Amino acid sequence: VLSWDTDTVDMDLLVTEPSGEICTFSNSFTKSGGRISPDIRDGYGPEEYLIRNAESGTYQVAARFKRDRRFQLNAGVHVKVDVFTNYGRPNQQRRSATAFLEKKGDRTVVAEVTW
């Protein structure tokens, strides 16, 4: 789950699956069953990725600073990724990670999950 702290920007969630396929709003359903929520262009998010039967390997969770609707952005954008495994089950776990993106076009890996 990707969220951010500035409501005038468009951030994108990108998840690179172990196969190398990237799940994002322009490729919202992957061959391995991953899916992503519609692109959120207003507000603070969230954008979400879900996979029910995760393949073994490492998933990279990245954020991309796509657009800014302000005339000038001086402070950048803080993003937060919450990763849930075994969601809704007794053994559910949650990890959070944050990152800072300075300007439009920036992209960074915020978290990695090995399954």
Pin down the residues of each PLM region.
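Intrinsic-disorder/low-complexity signal
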Residues: 1-115
